[in-house]
From Swiss-Prot:
Pfam families: CLN3. Belongs to the battenin family. This is Battenin. GO terms for molecular function: glycolipid binding; sulfatide binding. The modification Cysteine methyl ester is found at C435. GO terms for cellular component: autolysosome; caveola; cytoplasm; cytosol; early endosome; early endosome membrane; endoplasmic reticulum; endoplasmic reticulum membrane. Residues 1-25, 237-268 are annotated as: Disordered. Interacts with DCTN1, KIF3A, RAB7A and RILP. Interacts with CLN5. A motif (Lysosomal targeting motif. Required for AP1G1, AP2A2 and AP3D1 interaction) lies at residues 253-254. Highly glycosylated. It is found in: Lysosome membrane; Late endosome; Lysosome. It comes from Macaca fascicularis (Crab-eating macaque). Mediates microtubule-dependent, anterograde transport connecting the Golgi network, endosomes, autophagosomes, lysosomes and plasma membrane, and participates in several cellular processes such as regulation of lysosomal pH, lysosome protein degradation, receptor-mediated endocytosis, autophagy, transport of proteins and lipids from the TGN, apoptosis and synaptic transmission. A lipid is attached at C435 (S-farnesyl cysteine).
Length: 438
């Protein structure tokens, strides 16, 4: 990886001299590199997903009729706003927040579909640079937008940044000890929590959405600094005892007679080998698709319709709280891998579908009387989604050979994007149907 700092002091090659070894220096160097990479991947996960999360948290503001031109003087309505659609029992925008979801996810889907075919031919450093530039551009474009269409173009830039970054950094984990996957996953969960919480907090404090978005321009700069200045060279990594212990318990996902090789050879895999690896990955891809379909159908199809009038929170504030609590659950579970390892992720998919059915029934029948019960369900929803993500990639890292791991990571990261895209496509007509109910 050309962009990572990785100079190392060589040991003396002098012969004939017996010197007293200093075994603690290499150990300290190894520990220092371990923590630099751990922090580096955590920050990369945080920065990569930050713009994506902020755009979803701002979805109601992007589409709201209560915004003024330029997003410069947004004022939250009172606790009982006049419905946008007076003939509906819901307080609906003319366009579902799923429209923002689709703009925030479809470019990512295209990138992830094409990534296994040839993205590995492009060096990592240019990919990271493009990702950072797109993230910064998304904040600026949405902040200064005077129309929903222009704002959605900014959301598309955030999607390109997040999608390109995710497939790049997950592939990059193949060159480092498997422990960095846990740090990356925790960072992406942190992006959800900090992104939603920062947008909620700054707008609650009185900043306009424009000022809030412009205040976040330091995040893309932090992403570039984490990659180019913090990560050590992967060639210097030594997996160590933890890796050996994990490999002894590994159950191969792909049966092969070929000996394992060092990661980095995915570009030499034949189409037949890629297809064989892909078929083995379906056991993990399908449940992750289902989990993300269910949770984002809730987030972008139902959040806007779960509106309680018997509370001091306005509709926009309720939507931001939903997003923040969901992301808090995601962060907690994505950071829990060392405490709880789940092999059978199908169970998480089933539980998430039950969440969807329950909240959809509440939207239809309106039997929940307190917003705080919905808060608990949404927090639980986030816990399930985060656990599915981190355990899926951890299981794949354990059960694929080194020569297949880079390709497997790049391929599996399409799972969440595919599920989110399907949920957005179905949430749009559902929104229109429910908002026409009197």
């Amino acid at each position: 990886m050309g962009g990572c700092a990785g100079s190392r002091r060589r040991l003396s090659d002098s012969e004939g001299e017996e010197t007293v070894p200093e075994p603690r220096l290499p150990l300290l160097d190894h520990q220092g590199a371990h923590w630099k990479n751990a922090v580096g991947f955590w920050l990369l996960g945080l920065c990569n997903n930050f713009s994506y999360v902020v755009m979803l948290s701002a979805a109601h503001d992007i589409l709201s009729h209560e915004r003024t031109s330029g997003n410069q003087s947004h004022v939250d309505p009172g606790p009982a706003p006049i419905p946008h659609n007076s003939s509906s029992r819901f307080d609906c925008n003319s366009v579902s927040t799923a429209a923002v979801l689709l703009a925030d996810i479809l470019p990512t889907l295209v990138i992830k579909l094409l990534a296994p075919l040839g993205l590995h031919l492009l060096p990592y450093s240019p990919r990271v640079l493009v990702s950072g530039i797109c993230a910064a551009g998304s904040f600026v474009l949405v902040a200064f937008s005077h129309s929903v269409g222009t704002s959605l173009c900014g959301v598309v830039l955030a999607s390109i940044s997040s999608g390109l970054g995710e497939v790049t950094f997950l592939s990059l984990t193949a060159f480092y000890p498997r422990a960095v996957i846990s740090w990356w996953s925790s960072g992406t969960g942190g992006a959800g929590l900090l992104g939603a919480l920062s947008y909620l907090g700054l707008t609650q404090a009185g900043l306009s959405p424009q000022q809030t978005l412009l205040s976040m321009l330091g995040i893309p700069a932090l992403l570039l600094a984490s990659y180019f200045l913090l990560l050590t060279s992967p060639e210097a990594q030594d997996p160590g005892g933890e890796e050996e212990a994990e490999s002894s318990a590994r159950q191969p996902l792909i049966r092969t007679e070929a000996p394992e090789s060092k990661p980095g050879s995915s570009s030499s895999l034949s189409l037949r080998e890629r297809w064989t690896v892909f078929k083995g990955l379906l056991w993990y891809i399908v449940p992750l698709v289902v989990v993300y379909f269910a949770e984002y159908f809730i987030n972008q199809g139902l959040f806007e319709l779960l509106f309680f009038r018997n509370t001091s929170l306005s509709h926009a504030q309720q939507y931001r709280w939903y997003q923040m609590l969901y992301q808090a659950g995601v962060f907690a579970s994505r950071s829990s891998l060392r405490c709880c390892h789940i092999r059978f992720t199908w169970a998480l998919a089933l539980l998430q579908c039950l969440n969807l059915a329950f909240l959809l029934a509440d939207v239809w029948f309106g039997f929940l009387l307190s917003i705080y019960f919905v808060f608990l369900i949404i927090l639980y929803e986030g816990l399930l989604g985060g656990a599915a993500y981190v355990n899926t990639f951890h299981n794949i890292a354990l059960e694929t050979s080194d020569e297949h791991r880079e390709f497997a990571m790049a391929t599996t990261c399409i799972s969440d994007t595919l599920g989110i895209s399907l949920s957005g496509l179905l949430a749009l007509p559902l929104h229109d149907f429910l908002c026409q109910l009197s």
